[in-house]
Amino acid sequence: MQKILATMMVLALTIAAQAERIDSTQFVAFYNYTIQTQDEEGQNVTDSIRLALLVGTRATYCTTVLSYNKDGRASQEMLDAFSMHFQNVLTDVEKSSVVAVEPIYPYRYETHEPMAKVDWTLTGDTLTISGLLCHRATGKLYGKQWTAWYTEEMPSSAGPWKLRGLPGLIIKAEDAEGIHCFTLYETKNEVIDINMIGSPEYQKLSRKKLMEFKKKTLGNPRYPKEPTYYVPEGADEVLEVNVNGTFYSVGYNSHMMILQKSHVYQPLELE
């Protein structure tokens, strides 16, 4: 019991860990992020998690709502976050640099890269989303073509994940295949710190090396039915955590939730 409680506390502390402050927010934008994919039986499914985009004048930070709320309890939403392999992304606009941290059981991976410039094409199309007048733009990022809707009513060049660079906050963005979609559902005017992310304990890779590793590992046909097929025996100690009658597998050493089944991996980056 003590070990289980300790693991749950470590999960919380891992999510809540803070580092040096580099900026503070002007506001926080909240998005639903969905992925159209297939389950282990090949049936179409929609994966979904909530994201928080912390927007400052110098930097932005995109993470899960669980991390934003410092909620480290084992839950289905946390399991979904691990399943969707969403990166925590810190964009330092002043330095034109991006740091991304992604948990891929049983390790966390950290990449550093220059801030990518999306060559957006602005159009005259408009659409009202959540009461905001939005303008359509198209652009390509890391091998994927995107359609984004932005609003000049919120004068920020920020957007979810690594999408940014438009003359207004990105309200909705969807890739050309209709697989990945980010949709704003709320904003809050609050001032909180934006901190540097990363740790000496994380595995350091280039963005392209991590992309290749994910393609080889998560893109393997075995992955949906055996999400830990590639993990060496003894790499972690697995515990069963009971949360209100629901049991979750948690890595005691990795501080990660462990998937028993997963869905077909759908990469955000192709090149």
What are these regions (language model features)?
Residues 1-25:
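Bacterial Sec-dependent N-terminal signal peptides
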Residues 12, 124, 158-161, 238:
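Exposed boundary/loop context
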Residues 19-129, 133, 142, 146-147, ...:
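Extracellular or lumenal secretory-pathway regions
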Residues 45, 118-119, 154, 163-165:
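Short, glycine/acidic-rich beta->alpha junctions
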Residues 137-139, 173:
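Beta-strand-dense domains in secreted/periplasmic systems and polymorphic toxin scaffolds
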Residues 140-164:
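Short, surface-exposed, low-complexity cationic segments
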Residues 165-180:
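A contiguous pocket-lining binding segment that forms or flanks enzyme active sites
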